[in-house]
Amino acid sequence: MEEFVIPVFSETEIPYSLLSHYPLAVRTNVKIANVDEGHDVVKIPESDMIDVPRVSIVEALAAKPTRNDGIVVPRLLDITLRAYDDRKAMKSARGVEFMTNAKWMKWAIDDRMDIQPLKVAIDDHNAVNHQLFNCIVKARPANADTVYYSYFPLRDKVKKCNHTNLDLLRGLTTTEMFHMLQGAAYCLKSSYELITNSERNNTEETYAPGVHNRIRLVRGTRIGYKGEAYSRFVSSLVQVRIQGQTPPEIVDDIARLNEIRTEWINAQFDSTKIRALELCKILSAIGRKMLNTHEEPKDEMDLSTRFQFKLDDKFKKTDSEHINIFNVGAPATHEGRFYALIAIAATDTQRGRVWRTNPYPCLRGALIAAECQLGDVYHTLRQVYKWSLRQDYGRTEVPLENNKYVFSRINLFDSNLEVGDQVVHWKYEIDGPAETTYDNGYICKTEREDGELVCKISEEKYKTMLDRMIQGGWDQERFKLYSVLTDPNLLTIDFEKDAYLNIRSEFVLPSYFDQWIYSPMFNARLRITHGEIGTRKSADPWNKRVVFGYVKASTESPEYALGQYFDTRIQLYGDALSLKQSQSAVFQHQSQQEDFPVLTSYAKGDVVCPHSGGALYTFRKVALMLMANYERLSPDLHEGMEDHTYTHPSIGGANQKRILEMRDFSQLICFIIDYIFERHDQLRDMREARRILYLVQSLGEPQRLDVLSVASPNFSRYFLKLKDVQRISDLNVINFLPLLFLIQDNISYWHRQWAVPMILYDDTIKLIPVEVGAYANRFGIKSFFNFTRFHPGDAKKRQKADDTHKEFGLISFNYYANTKIAQGGVHTPVVTTKLDTLKIHLSSLCAGLADSVVYTLPVAHPKKCIVLIIVGDDKLEPHVRSEQVVSKYYFSRKHVSGVVSICIGQNDQLKVYSSGIVRHRICEKFILRYKCKVVLVKMPGYVFGNDELMTKLLNV
């Protein structure tokens, strides 16, 4: 057949039963009404489209699709056609057979990050219905496997949008590169009520037992977040007693727990009244609402199950600790015993003290719920209920039961603290650039100022680790950087645990409070001090909350290595689904930067698009920063230029042209290797670069080395040199290796606290452990960028390697040749389905959304090819939409021989465009007393067919 008929009909004018024999039909009498001439995307969840939830964009990007009827990979046909083209002839017993590169095809499919969870309806005529805003596209089941949605956020003329390559925006969000950061802060726990008991004139005095001394405050005054009472308390001039109270956020949850408690007490403590699963769900809800850092959700299923068993045990009357808790007299109460048993169960599950920073919601929620009743939980357990931590949980935590911990970490992006409220917060300053020479390089030097504390590597502790390293090789699970640092140790100090009321009810601040801590290896100076809330919470996260605090944009974040001293938040806010909403002010801030016009198509201060302004600027700026560091790490010498000076770090423009051409982080990684080691000033294709990284990360040693030797032979030779290091310059290659293993937008680390080896160019060269995902979930380049800043000068590079240096090389080679650190389990339903979510959200920040579905019509004769039939709205001209869709067929563009693009408006206006081997006519069709329009698609000389094209291609 040379003709293909597409009915365009209204069911009010003709029943579909008369048209159901057509492979494709368009029903126009079911629409979602426009709002202000734009699509009402808020209606997507209740429509048969794709599964995008009606939640905030932050929640939507972490959401797992729940209501869908299967998935579709938009570029699946493109991939399978390429695999078909690349088949190789193989001899077999049956003669010559053609074999497909199944491994490549599987990788290409798995590498797609634009999977669509479909919500479709199958009608009474077995047609699969794909709903659009202006119509419903009905496809026969035999042809439905190639149908997918194509969403496109429209260009805002004022913002000069360029919405091509939105994969880059998605990749930045996945690798935490599109996130701003704000300093960490602490405030008095909202689950505590601090009530004044006595006062003193100065900290030299002691509080006499039973004496209620009054100086400035009335006994019984509540300590709030500001005012004289707060000031005197944090100055350790007020003695307080603590009682629990319920924060507003969890009033309903605590009420439900108290109902269960009352039922349990009234039933004479019958354990059957305690339903562990229900308790665990309520406690998890509390833990999630009272989260003090914004981080990746933890999978708590296994731990939750253990917790439920512990709850069952503790509420049994025969349990020894249950008996002991009930044998304790006043001031113990039955109401308190309920929460005491919950806290003990949580502690046994954790096998240690539970803190507010616990990553598991159910345990964190158990602690907070108990605080609302008991005040300081572990102090009350010991003093009132005569229960103490078990010795086998660690002796160091038992003495802490004498203290009461009154401060908790807060997330300033989410905190509801009011202007004027007092907090304790961290200041975080980065070392600026310095001038040096090629002969000296840029090494990690300790140059502290007067009065500064210093955090650096302890030579004694490091020697112990080095001995273990030489004897047993690299231990990625047990080598920790914090274990070799001096005090105050920036990787372990925690104000929430270090500030407390001691046994004499005196408020104690840590020795490092209000002092600068300098750490040259982190290029940072930090200081924790008192502060004041200067602005109210706002929906836009670009909001510096503390008067002398800090907030940094995505382009600045890689330099901030110590993740526990700040919180991060994606530079998008508002609803995932909205007709029109405001974008973050961070993009206006970025547009004011001096290099913004150079790296984007905007003038300084322009109103910018979050993608073509924010995402492109972020990627390009970070790429230049990374390139600048790695150029200095080149193992090559600078003959004749040893005395030349340069400023480091500084961003040059030598590679700017190539970086402006990049579309993906994998291209940047390959370019760094190619430019520095291969002397190639050229850019690899994005698919080739992604494939290389995938193979390096996933293959074992022999194949991994083969891939490197083919892709980058000079780099491979330097890598192999690590087995026999001769000069210091041979070690430089080690710090390039994290690039290959720790960055990709669709990987997950095997464990987020494993450590990879990197060289620290200190006064003495050290091989140090860099944890890939610890400290507030750093990811990708943030985990190691800081250490790429240091590099040896030519004088150091020329030096012969000693035995320790040779060990560094061999240890690093053995680790990186075999590591599987990038092969953790990816949460595929979440990671792979977010491109359309971002497109729809971006449409609300720009000029709205255009939607369409794409249907593939196979052609069987005289040559095998495909024709694309696109049905969409009238927000785009049909020929423009045609070009957009065809451009996605990267591998198999030669097989797309024709396109039919049908546009339908809200008033049923019909426009059609055709190109290639196809022609079209719009005709009237009459059946009995009914009529409709049809798009008659003609292919002179060609015969369409092959309904099972996709099935065949996936099984070649």
Curated annotation (Swiss-Prot):
Pfam families: Orbi_VP2. GO terms for molecular function: structural molecule activity. One of its GO terms (biological process) is virion attachment to host cell. One of its GO terms (cellular component) is viral inner capsid. It comes from the Viruses. The keyword Metal-binding does not apply. InterPro entries: Capsid_VP2_Orbivir (IPR001742). Transmembrane segments: none annotated. Keywords: Capsid protein, Clathrin-mediated endocytosis of virus by host, Host-virus interaction, Inner capsid protein, Viral attachment to host cell, Viral penetration into host cytoplasm, Virion, Virus endocytosis by host, Virus entry into host cell. Belongs to the orbivirus VP2 family. This is Outer capsid protein VP2. The gene is Segment-2.
